[in-house]
Amino acid sequence: MSWKPLILCVDDTPSVLEGLKMLLEENGYRVLTATNGKEAVQAFTSHSVDLVLLDFHMPEMNGDMAAARMKDSKPDVPIALLSSDECLPSRDLEVVDCFIPKSKPIVSLLEKVDYLVSLRFLFRPFGALNAQAAAERVSAHQAGPESERPNGISMKKDGIQKTL
């Protein structure tokens, strides 16, 4: 039996959550689900998660706030923020590693998931450095920069921003 990465999927729309779960399981991932930000933070802290796919617009706690709490406890775990919005203010994206509009094709989502999971294991030996970079992202998020990010899939790793 081979080991499979565990992905935490968070969305308040049951059909979206079930679709993500089926897609990821069909592609070799184990999946844990939550329907709001508070549930997500609890699941994140009590499980050894390898990646988080987090909806932005949710009741009780938006995705950016849930991501900030997650990064406080485990800064080396990559978090991808998903949204039906094509673009979000940069202050909402500072703490996450990747932004994926839900309108992007499924193959784009799977490519980003594969990439983020591989980065997680590639950079795992450098956890202290990643923790420092994540702490800087959390601080920047709390400061609230004013600029907007362009449309597309934005990825950030150790302070380097790429928009695909």
Where are these regions (language model features)?
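Active-site residues of response regulator receiver
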Residues: D55
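Receiver (REC) domain active-site loop signature in two-component systems and cognate sites
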Residues: M58
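Conserved phosphotransfer cores of two-component systems
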Residues: T45-H47, R69-D76, E94
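Acidic catalytic/metal-coordinating carboxylates
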Residues: T35-E39, N62-A66
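Two-component/phosphorelay signaling modules centered on CheY-like receiver
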Residues: P14-L32
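CheY-like receiver
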Residues: R120-L164
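C-terminal output helix
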Residues: K104-V117, F121-N130
